[in-house]
């Protein structure tokens, strides 16, 4: 994955006026524009600090992660539903977690696209006690 594409992916995240992120409890996960994924970023592993290294492993699904983080794979599960009270989309995972997605992110989706995140137990090798996970990037899937 070249630097130009990385800049494109992170464009919405580096602009403080465009809050394209989701929150899981108190942990911040970032939503990447144009791609369906969630990334757990530790405060000490800020990907926007110059000099931080990233890598992508294209294996059907690109996995983007900070080389400096001791990460494990986790693919979140659920599908988008509407939560009118919070005026955001809610991703409810099979294990009961709720992930709230800021409406600003929906600007990156076309009318013909629906964001889906799936859980594949075979993809989950381990989850450390501190909860550091590797990002999993999946293409947006058409709802047709």
Residue spans for each PLM region:
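DNA polymerase processivity clamps
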Residues: 1-144
């Amino acid at each position: 994955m070249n630097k130009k594409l990385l800049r494109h992916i992170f464009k919405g995240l580096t602009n403080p006026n465009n809050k394209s992120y989701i929150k899981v409890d108190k942990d911040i996960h970032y939503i990447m524009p144009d791609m369906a994924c969630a990334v757990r970023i530790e405060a000490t592993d800020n990907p926007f600090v110059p000099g931080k290294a990233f890598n992508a492993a294209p294996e059907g699904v690109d996995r983007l992660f900070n080389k400096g983080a001791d990460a494990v794979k986790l693919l979140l599960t659920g599908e988008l539903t509407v939560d009118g009270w919070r005026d955001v989309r809610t991703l409810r995972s099979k294990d009961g977690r709720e992930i709230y997605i800021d409406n600003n992110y929906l600007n990156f989706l076309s009318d013909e696209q629906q964001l889906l995140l799936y859980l594949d137990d075979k993809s989950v090798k381990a989850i450390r006690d501190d909860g550091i996970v590797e990002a999993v990037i999946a293409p947006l899937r058409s709802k047709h």
